[in-house]
Amino acid sequence: MNFPYYIAQKVAFSGKKSFSRLIICIATIAVALSVAIMIITTAVVRGFKNQISDKIFGLWGQIHITDASIGQSAEVTPVDMKQTFYPSLDTLRHIEHLVPNKNFLTSKSDPFTPKKTKGGIHHIQVFATKSGIIKTKAEIEGIILKGAGRDFDTTFMTKSLVEGRFIKFQDSSASRDIIISNYTANRLKIKVNDKFVIHFLDQNQQQLKRAFTVCGIYKTGLEEYDKKIAFVDLSMVQGLLGWKKNQVAGFEVFIDNIDDIEPIAEYIHNEVLPNNLYAESLRDKFKNIFEWLDLQNVNEIVIIVLMAIVAIINMITALLILILERTEMIGILKSFGTNNWTIRKIFLYHAAIIVGTGLFFGNLFGLSICYLQEKYKFIKLSETDYYLSYAPIELHLPTVLLLNLATLLLVVLFLIVPTYLITRISPVRAIRMK
């Protein structure tokens, strides 16, 4: 029989009313709330980052293939659609790449080790863009037309449509359909099936006009992009730019797993593309927004550390009160020859029972809040500030299990120090105090 654990159980579940029962109750609640907040924080941060990333990647893909001279001039250099990798690049699955070897400095192994990506490429599509100005009777608004071809993946756009339909392509001529954002529609007071004119400048700075009919209205919540982007037939953009049917601004590549974005981008650039083309990940292209998303990791860590400190302080306080209240018991055990470490283990087991109870109720509360938020979305956000209208939830079971295990081990580890007080208790004095 495990003697310390047996005594700890008897003490913990004795049912005796005392001041320490109140302190234990407070400590249990503190641990429960700390764990619940940790779980909710990790779920919200994970959901927040993934949903915003999905929106950006849904609009633009994860990797762009463009002319190598992009960024060196204001003019966009067209790329020939007839490439050896198009459209067969979407058959690329797992690729092997090299990652730094963490044990390189402590062993004689190679500095890099081979590793396979988690997924591959599931889609590739062409795109082209052209800036213009929408002019209605009431307002004027700048806009960027993004050309969508027949290879356009409509999955994200279908989910983002709040009204109307996607573009209907025509065989004989470019479609006049246009999909505008909800922001643009409200600002210009435009509805589905309304017509309006967009003004452009051609290569010779001559003014062009094109009439469009609104076929759909979308909303991503990314106001920075919703303000600017409208979707039209790719052929329309090619015509406005004076390009041939086989000329586009580039290719958008969609991958299976976001963790593979860097190795796949490097593989495409080094192994697939000719010298005149360049592959760039969206993380590099839109650094600001992804750096902002990465900052959420710092917030997550700060909250978890603070909650861990709260749990530790409350448990230390509770343990010290338990020791002081059980001074007579400690004296009796010492008088029977029980060593200090065995007695310390009794209180550590008792503390572990308290922490375990707190973990149970903390998980129950935290997971319940996550479930209710996922189902009813009762915690609302300002979409203008956060790109989302509600707090997103994405639970990750390994993370939840790790939080529970780390909290239990960390708290119990910190409680070893205050149990040192037991070694200072004299059995004679402890018994006399009673």
Please report, for each region that a protein language model flagged, where it lies by residue.
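Hydrophobic alpha-helical transmembrane segments of multi-pass inner-membrane transport and secretion
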Residues: R21-R46, D294-M329, A352-F361, L409-L413
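Hydrophobic, regular-secondary-structure patches
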Residues: A36, A43-G142, Q170-D171
